Amino acid sequence: MKSLITLILTLFLFVGCSSDSEVIPPIMPYSYSTTELDLINKVNDYRTTNGLSNLQPVDHIGYLCSEHNQNMINTTVVGHHDFESRINNLKMTMGAARVSELVAGNFSTNQSVMSAFLNDPLCKKILDEQDRNRIGVAVSISPTGRKYYTLIIIN
């Protein structure tokens, strides 16, 4: 009986006191639409015109952008809800040191959303950051026809 109690206590100590290691999320595939690729090209055209390097599209970042768009569609709120989880995901999966997110809603064209980003000082500052090298984009349309945009830029 004493050995059974010792065994149970030992198992508890190994199981109950083991460290929780973080689980690295899977890297998800994503296929960019023509509209999304056009928006990435507009971002890169702006950057090269201003002496900055192109941002490389990454499928996993696009997937996270698409997930965020679905959240914005479901809540009808354009914002950065749960941005911290996207930051943590990209740090663990992509080794991102810095993560920035741009969101927009209800613009009819990529050119109009780019103009809005460039007219907003904070968004423009993000687009102008030299140390960024990767991008993900999603453009989603709600059942009511409203467009939602998420761009995530990392280094």
Label the model's feature ranges:
Residues 13-16:
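C-terminal motif of bacterial Sec signal peptides marking the signal peptidase cleavage site
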Residues 104-155:
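Disulfide-stabilized extracellular recognition modules
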Residues 66-111:
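Short, surface-exposed glycine/acidic/tryptophan-bearing loops
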Residues 37, 41-45, 62-70, 101, ...:
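Solvent-exposed, polar/charged alpha-helical surfaces in well-ordered, non-transmembrane soluble domains
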Residues 23-74:
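A short alpha-helix/helix-coil micro-patch that ends at or immediately precedes a cysteine
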Residues 48, 97-99, 132-133, 147:
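Loop/turn elements at helix/coil->beta-strand transitions in domains of secreted/extracellular proteins
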Residues 1-10:
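Sec-dependent signal peptide recognition
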Residues 49-63, 76-87, 124-140:
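Surface-exposed patches in mature extracellular/periplasmic domains of secreted proteins
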